[in-house]
Design a protein with these regions (language model features):
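Ribosome large-subunit tunnel/peptidyl-transferase-proximal elements
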Residues: 1-106, 142-144
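Generic structural "secondary-structure junction" signal
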Residues: 25, 59, 120-123, 134
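Extended, charged amphipathic interaction segments
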Residues: 102-125
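C-terminal edge-of-domain segments
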Residues: 127-147
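Eukaryotic intrinsically disordered and solvent-exposed regulatory patches
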Residues: 92, 126-127
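Glycine-centered flexibility motif
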Residues: 66-68, 115, 127
């Protein structure tokens, strides 16, 4: 992961990035899809409600055996991933405050990509070992001041 996923940044923007976090790629993709385009403060409130298990994140991808929630369809409460996204949004909020941007910030880009893969082994019977792979996740966000 060299740079950001967008090439041209808007005039008044703030950005932040978290690299190689140990969270689920599938849950992170669904959270990013849900929060993209929302206001920054409203996105933080949504993540607080997800961590309190009051609001579910609607899933649009990776829907195998995902239970339906009342009013939104298939969804879950990914608490661990929500904590990481909350940290990311707090970081970009601090960056925007440092740049002197106002409080009216909108998330224009929120992307998730796979990071480094860690190869691990689990012991099996008869002295064998089975490999399993752990994907790490890169997150990045760009917010713009709304007029």
């Amino acid at each position: 992961m060299k740079g950001y996923s967008i090439d041209k940044f808007p005039e008044k923007h703030a950005r932040s990035r978290i690299r190689e976090e140990d969270i689920s790629v599938k849950d992170a993709v669904n959270i990013a899809h849900f929060l993209r385009g929302k206001k920054l403060e409203s996105a933080k409130d949504i993540l607080d409600n997800v961590m309190a298990k009051k609001t579910a994140i609607p899933y649009f991808r990776y829907l195998d055996s995902i239970s339906h929630r009342k009013g939104i369809g298939p969804g879950r409460y990914p608490v661990k991933e929500s904590k990481v996204f909350k940290k990311l949004l707090d970081d970009v909020s601090a960056n925007a405050e440092f740049k002197g941007l106002s409080e009216n910030l909108v998330i224009v880009s929120l992307s998730v990509s796979k990071g480094r893969m860690i190869k691990k082994f689990t012991p099996k019977a008869y002295g064998r070992a089975g490999a399993f792979f752990k994907d790490l996740v890169n997150l990045e966000v760009v917010v713009v001041e709304e007029e």
